[in-house]
Amino acid sequence: MSLAKVKHIVLVLSGKGGVGKSSVTTQLALSLSLAGHSVGVLDVDLTGPSIPRMFGIEDAKVTQAPGGWLPITVHEADPSAGVGSLRVMSLGFLLPKRGDAVVWRGPKKTAMVRQFLSDVFWDETDYLLIDTPPGTSDEHISLAENLLQKARPGQLAGAVVVTTPQAVATADVRKELNFCTKTNIRVLGVVENMCGFVCPNCSECTNIFMSGGGEVMANDFGVRFLGRVPIDPQFLVLIETGKRPTYPAGTTVDGKDISTPAGASTSEEEEVKDGSRLVHKYKDCSLAPIFSKITADVISAVQQ
Ligand SMILES: Nc1ncnc2c1ncn2[C@@H]1O[C@H](COP(=O)(O)OP(=O)(O)OP(=O)(O)O)[C@@H](O)[C@H]1O
Ligand code: SF4
């Protein structure tokens, strides 16, 4: 992989599947871009690459240049809007049937990932986020070893560990934190996803599971707790259909009114799933202010 022009690499890890690792990667990428940084996302989750779907670029065609595979541009930098560029590369682009999980056995998988890591050309990138397969298997260890070998000293900034309130109660997330210690990867912090539910009718956030476990666990391990993220069905609508999130009158996040103004544009063109508009639509999501804070904390952890 040509990493020469990448400033910082951040891994996104989870001890088990389905906790929202790819959603967190996507939202970190959008928030970093909204903060003006140039961002790359590399999806090596062989268990079912979901990143192309999340960015609305499932049908994108990857091309090859002399320097390697060229990542897909979700949007270019727009300095007048303070937005940085966003590019994505996924193993999913190379699978014959998009969205399939890879069924190869260990050594073939590892060889594929190794080659994939070497063959992608990244242009000027402030943050490269890597969405990894869930778990702490041998496959993970070899992925981490490969990365550590390829990155220059200090380039691999660390890992963001994603969990859910239920997963905290299991051993998986602790295993993930132990995995980081074993592989010498610094933990930048823990995100607790799906810690509550944003009601689509009144936008009240209700804690459906016992929340707070992520923070206790982060304290136990002496790592930073980055924050809690509720389930917002409007985020799912944005990802699945490309529709701009809308909220009833009076909806606030941290005291800020995020309700959809009367007469806001919902034209056909606006509704169309189009990766280049995603970042601007995401700005209207109730999760965006939460991720803006998480992202600021990740940046400060990277720079420490
Ligand atoms: N906070 C959230 N609000 C609304 N939907 C969410 C949230 N977090 C995750 N989801 C949705 O839950 C589903 C699973 O999330 P995601 O694919 O990010 O999990 P994952 O941990 O990456 O899974 P896998 O292990 O299969 O890769 C997705 O449809 C995603 O959009
Ligand atoms: S206030 Fe909201 S969450 Fe509670 S019952 Fe009414 S609509 Fe549902």
From Swiss-Prot:
One of its GO terms (molecular function) is ATP hydrolysis activity. Residues 249-271 are annotated as: Disordered. It comes from the Eukaryota. The keyword Cytoplasm applies. It holds the Pfam family ParA. Its main location: cytoplasm. One of its GO terms (biological process) is tRNA wobble uridine modification. One of its GO terms (cellular component) is cytosolic [4Fe-4S] assembly scaffold complex. ATP binds at residues 15-22. Its cofactor is [4Fe-4S] cluster. Keywords: 4Fe-4S, ATP-binding, Cytoplasm, Iron, Iron-sulfur, Metal-binding, Nucleotide-binding. [4Fe-4S] cluster binds at residues 199, 202. Signal peptide: none annotated. Belongs to the Mrp/NBP35 ATP-binding proteins family. NUBP2/CFD1 subfamily. HAMAP family: Mrp_NBP35, NUBP2. This is Cytosolic Fe-S cluster assembly factor cfd1. The lineage of its organism: Eukaryota, Fungi, Dikarya, Ascomycota, Pezizomycotina. The gene is cfd1.
